[in-house]
Structure formats: structure tokens, C-alpha cells
Curated annotation (Swiss-Prot):
<feature type="binding site">
    <location>
        <position position="122"/>
    </location>
    <ligand>
        <name>L-aspartate</name>
    </ligand>
</feature>
<feature type="binding site">
    <location>
        <position position="39"/>
    </location>
    <ligand>
        <name>ATP</name>
    </ligand>
</feature>
<feature type="binding site">
    <location>
        <position position="278"/>
    </location>
    <ligand>
        <name>L-citrulline</name>
    </ligand>
</feature>
<dbReference type="GO" id="GO:0005737">
    <property type="term" value="C:cytoplasm"/>
</dbReference>
<protein>
    <recommendedName>
        <fullName>Argininosuccinate synthase</fullName>
        <ecNumber>6.3.4.5</ecNumber>
    </recommendedName>
</protein>
<dbReference type="GO" id="GO:0004055">
    <property type="term" value="F:argininosuccinate synthase activity"/>
</dbReference>
<comment type="pathway">
    <text>Amino-acid biosynthesis; L-arginine biosynthesis; L-arginine from L-ornithine and carbamoyl phosphate: step 2/3.</text>
</comment>
<dbReference type="GO" id="GO:0006526">
    <property type="term" value="P:L-arginine biosynthetic process"/>
</dbReference>
<dbReference type="Pfam" id="PF20979">
    <property type="entry name" value="Arginosuc_syn_C"/>
</dbReference>
<dbReference type="InterPro" id="IPR018223">
    <property type="entry name" value="Arginosuc_synth_CS"/>
</dbReference>
<keyword id="KW-0028">Amino-acid biosynthesis</keyword>
<comment type="subunit">
    <text>Homotetramer.</text>
</comment>
<keyword id="KW-0547">Nucleotide-binding</keyword>
<feature type="binding site">
    <location>
        <position position="190"/>
    </location>
    <ligand>
        <name>L-citrulline</name>
    </ligand>
</feature>
<keyword id="KW-0436">Ligase</keyword>
<feature type="binding site">
    <location>
        <position position="127"/>
    </location>
    <ligand>
        <name>L-aspartate</name>
    </ligand>
</feature>
<feature type="binding site">
    <location>
        <position position="126"/>
    </location>
    <ligand>
        <name>L-citrulline</name>
    </ligand>
</feature>
Length: 409
């Protein structure tokens, strides 16, 4: 991209030091008109200071939006219908937030006549990929500015010097290197970098901001129930709640019971491994509950097929392919599987553990009469099992006979 080819750019703006430097850099080095977009995804920060700071920089068009309900309803819940876990552990809290931010940037760009969008992701991480794949999927001709890949501010010292030269306020705690970086939204909080870069060293308790330690959690069990309708959680303890309100309440319950901590070394899409410390209190509870209600409402082969597709689905989200045709195809299959996933799950929360205490559904496929160890009154003829076993053993018997004669597998 030519240095001054951008005329008007929509910046994903947090109001923090890094994106404030980016804002000023776009104005001074690129000569671009900047439109700021700040999204409330439940990160727990006051966002009006971002508006005031943008005004201080002379920004005329400022968007500060509460997207918590949209985030949970249209992004988090569809993902949880799949029980998505990246590399078997990560609940994708950062990954699932990027498509919504990118989508709103593009919508705003089209509304205000901007020819470009910009983000504050570095050139080493996954977020640059997630943002830009979404941008190009939604607006193929959009121009993208990624300052961390372009500018000469390659050190913290240079960043601070630029900030001071352009009268960008610097909080006292930003003048030194932060001990680790934090990204947060309503689903999770992630901490990476600096003191966490050695995977052999346990994270200090100061890293955890959304959960108390399991050791410090109450010595009494917290009992709750979650109601599901077609795969989505709709009520907590019998009280109907909006998606964001329900997840917020689950976060509080998880926090108080030391639930949802994860120390993970993951494989980034860009090729390197990274260590992250994640807190997903409400999501951890929700995942356990969703799997429990599926256990009685999904057909065996449907459940197994869904489980076999989950790693691919999770990988697509992690790598930034939310708006890809293959993710949409998988989502259609997953959503179809949830038509019968309705009912109630009872849980016990205790010192970092989520324990399923019961599950019930009007669509339950579980037959106590069929599986009983007592007299089933003819519900199941055990003699039928002999033919079932013989048919399934046929290929094994044939292979075994060849094997005894020295044949290959």
C-alpha cells in the first residue's frame, strides 16, 4: 500500500496507549481522517474515557457501542453449540471476539464513506490474521492499515517518545513495561507475555483477575440449574435471562468458586507456540452443562459425528475463518443437531470443579426401562445381542484366520 493512499480510516480503538499512538500516527504520518470505533464486549472497563480521548485528538466521528448482547447471542452461543475447544482445551475467548469487532468496523466504514480500516494487533500474533480475514471477507476491496507491521516504533522507548512528542497522555503505570498483557471480554480474560513467557514457571496469583483460587473458594457447594432451548442457555435457576446477562451471572458464580482457570501452551496460526493464562469462569460452567444436556438428547451417531467435526470447527475460529463458507457449513450442521437439545441441567460448583448433578429433557433418549439391571418386562431381548455380536465380529474372524496363517493386517 502506498504510504499516503488512505484517506479515511476506521480504527478499532480501545483508548489505551497503543491505539492512541496509532490514532495519532494515522493522522500525522498518513494524513488520514480517523474514525474511532470502541466496542463494549464486557471487558469491564469504562469506555467513555475512550470517547473523550478521541475528541481530544480532534476525531469528529466517534462510535462507542455496547455489543455485549450481540456478542453472546450471535457469536458465543453458536460456538458453544459446537462445544468448541481449540487443541482440546482453549474456549476461544479472544478468537470469537474479533469477527464482531471487524464486522462493525466494516459496517461503520461503509456508513461513513471510509476507504480503510485499522487495528492494533502486532505482526507476531493471531489477531492480525483474524481481523484481516474478516475485513476481506466482508469488504474485499477494503484497505487495511496494520501499524505494528509498518511503522518504525519498534521498541517501548520509541512508542513513549512518540506519545510524549504528540501530547498523548501516558498513565504512570504505562511508563514502565507492563508485567504481562491482558485481553478481556464477557467470555474470558487472557494474560500473555513478559513474566508469562517461560512455560516452566507457574503464573503468580496477580495474573488472575476474574477468579479466586480454588484453594480460597468456599468450602460449601453452590447448586445451580441451567435451562436450554435448542442448544442455547435461556434461564438460570429457573429465571429467564438474556444471553449476556446469563453469561455475566455464570461468570460471577464461576469466579466465586474458583472455576475456569487454564494455563496453556498453544500453537498459533502464524507458526509459533505461545503461552497464555486464561480465565473463562462462566464459559467453563456453560460447556459442562451443554454437554450434559446433549448426552440425553442427541442420537449416538449424531453426537459422535458432531464431536468429530468439533476440532476442525474450533480451528477455523481460532485461525480467523469465522466468515468462511466452511465455517458456515459446519454451523448449519451443528445448529440442526440442536433442535432437540432442550431441557434442564443441575450442577454443583465446588473449588474449581463443575459437577453434573442431574439432567432432564422432554426430548430425552434415555430409557431407564431399557437399561435397568432389574426385570425390564420384555423391553429388551438380550438374545438379540448374539446376532449383533456375530455380525460385527465377522470381519475380525476373517482377519484373524488370515493372521494365523501369517497374513498382513
Amino acid at each position: 500500500m502506498a504510504e499516503n493512499s488512505v484517506k479515511k480510516v476506521v480504527l478499532a480503538y480501545s483508548g489505551g496507549l497503543d491505539t492512541s499512538v496509532i490514532l495519532r500516527w494515522l493522522q500525522t504520518e498518513r494524513g488520514a481522517e480517523v474514525v474511532t470505533f470502541t466496542a463494549d464486549l464486557g471487558q469491564g472497563e469504562e469506555l467513555e474515557p475512550a470517547r473523550r480521548k478521541a475528541e481530544m485528538f480532534g476525531v469528529k466521528e466517534i462510535f462507542v457501542e455496547d455489543l455485549r448482547e450481540t456478542f453472546v447471542k450471535d457469536f458465543v452461543f453458536p460456538m458453544f453449540r459446537a462445544n468448541a475447544l481449540y487443541e482440546g482445551q482453549y474456549l476461544l475467548g479472544t478468537s470469537i471476539a474479533r469477527p464482531l469487532i471487524a464486522q462493525r468496523q466494516i459496517e461503520i466504514a461503509e456508513a461513513v464513506g471510509a476507504d480503510a480500516v485499522a487495528h492494533g494487533a502486532t505482526g507476531k500474533g493471531n489477531d492480525q490474521v483474524r481481523f484481516e480475514l474478516a475485513y476481506y471477507a466482508l469488504k474485499p476491496d477494503v484497505k487495511v492499515v496494520a501499524p505494528w507491521r509498518e511503522w518504525s516504533l519498534t521498541s517501548r522507548t520509541k512508542l513513549l517518545e512518540f506519545a510524549e512528542a504528540h501530547q498523548i497522555p501516558i498513565a504512570k503505570d504505562k511508563r514502565g513495561e507492563a508485567p504481562f498483557s491482558v485481553d478481556a471480554n464477557l467470555l474470558h480474560s487472557s494474560s500473555e507475555g513478559k513474566i508469562l513467557e517461560d512455560p516452566a514457571q507457574a503464573p503468580d496469583e496477580i495474573v488472575y483477575q476474574r477468579t479466586i483460587s480454588p484453594e480460597a473458594a468456599p468450602d460449601v457447594v453452590t447448586e445451580i440449574s441451567i435451562d436450554f432451548a435448542q442448544g442455547d442457555a435461556v434461564a438460570l435457576n429457573g429465571v429467564a435471562l438474556s444471553p449476556a446477562t446469563l453469561l455475566t451471572r455464570l461468570n460471577e458464580l464461576g469466579r466465586d468458586n474458583g472455576i475456569g482457570r487454564l494455563d496453556l501452551v498453544e500453537n498459533r496460526f502464524v507458526g509459533m507456540k505461545s503461552r497464555g493464562v486464561y480465565e473463562t469462569p462462566g464459559g467453563t460452567i456453560l460447556l459442562a452443562a451443554h454437554r450434559a444436556i446433549e448426552s440425553i438428547t442427541l442420537d449416538r451417531e449424531a453426537a459422535h459425528l458432531k464431536d468429530s467435526l468439533m476440532p476442525r470447527y474450533a480451528e477455523l475460529i481460532y485461525n480467523g475463518f469465522w466468515f468462511s463458507p466452511e465455517r458456515r457449513m459446519l454451523q448449519a450442521l451443528i445448529d440442526a443437531s440442536q433442535n432437540s437439545v432442550t431441557g434442564r441441567v443441575r450442577l454443583k460448583l465446588y473449588k474449581g470443579n463443575v459437577i453434573v448433578a442431574g439432567r432432564e429433557s422432554p426430548n430425552s433418549l434415555y430409557s431407564a426401562r431399557m437399561v435397568t439391571f432389574e426385570d425390564d418386562e420384555g423391553a429388551y431381548n438380550q438374545q438379540d445381542a448374539a446376532g449383533f455380536i456375530k455380525l460385527n465380529a465377522l470381519r475380525l474372524r476373517l482377519g484373524g484366520a488370515i493372521g494365523r496363517r501369517g497374513g498382513a493386517l
